[in-house]
Amino acid sequence: MNADIAYLDASAAVKLLMTERESPALRRWLRPRPVRASASLLRVELLRIVRRAGLPGLIPEARKLLAGVHLIHLDDSLLDRAADLDPTDLRSLDSIHLAAAASLGDELAAIVSYDDRLLAAATSLGLPIATPS
């Protein structure tokens, strides 16, 4: 299998919605990797970010972005794997993202994130990472 799926966490997805310093580099990095995935909790995370930023006009664009991402269902098996992940100080949502990304197996190109703690945990688990900037 080809490693062609880019796994996006909220810190990366928001850069596709709102222009930030890293947004152009992220878009360039994703261009040859059109298949994107994330845990289904991204739906809540991204819409909450938009609402917290006071930008309700971006909600339709956020929903459009989410429609282009394969959202991985959070079933009991995935949640159990997330609960058992090391390091023990891993935050709950980060552990869910890592378990979801790991579930992609050989198809995972990289976990795309700008969250240092999530990236460190992914590296410790042997998962490929990318932080285009």
Where are these regions (language model features)?
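Short, well-structured N-terminal submotif of metal-dependent ribonuclease cores
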Residues: 1-38, 51-61, 126-127, 133
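Short active-site oxyanion
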Residues: 3-4, 33-36, 67-70, 105-110
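Residues within alpha-helical segments
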Residues: 11-14, 63, 83, 102, ...
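A generic structural signal for short hydrophobic patches within well-formed alpha-helices
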Residues: 13-14, 43, 118-119
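Phosphate- and divalent-cation-binding pockets in alpha/beta enzyme and binding domains
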Residues: 25, 45, 81, 120-121
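Active-site-proximal, substrate-binding regions of enzyme catalytic domains
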Residues: 40-77, 81-84
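Active-site neighborhoods of divalent-metal-dependent phosphate/nucleic-acid chemistry enzymes
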Residues: 70-120, 127-128
